[in-house]
Amino acid sequence: MSIILDTLRTAPPPQTNPARPLLGSFPPAPILPLSPIQYLTAAIDSVAPLVKIRQQRGVMGGGASLPIPVPLGVKQRRRTAMQWILSSADKRKESRLADRVAREIIAVAEGKSSAWERRATVHKMGVSARSNVRLTMMRRRR
């Protein structure tokens, strides 16, 4: 962990992507390397998904499953975001795991990580499946 924090501390400030901004409650990007813990927290919280897609079986009949968006708590959001960051870090070419994770966190802060695409995909599926929430609630009442 100390290697990751040292890399974040010594890295140049991230060039943020306006299409994928960090959350507004954190300090601006040029100040982030001064406090690597906030850097790490800002990257994780910014890429964390708001919902997950749960497949409800037996609602549509015929063996088909119905996607239903379910809101996530803070701990679940952060855990999912960290899993996405680690899976993206595994695909990097650096030799040490700490270097790969640190570079992936920097890529998240700059809006270049594949975790942003995963987040966008999950949110897009959640928006398209939001009408299914009512269907499952009506089924339960019967």
Language-model-derived ranges and their functions:
Residues 2-142:
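Strongly charged
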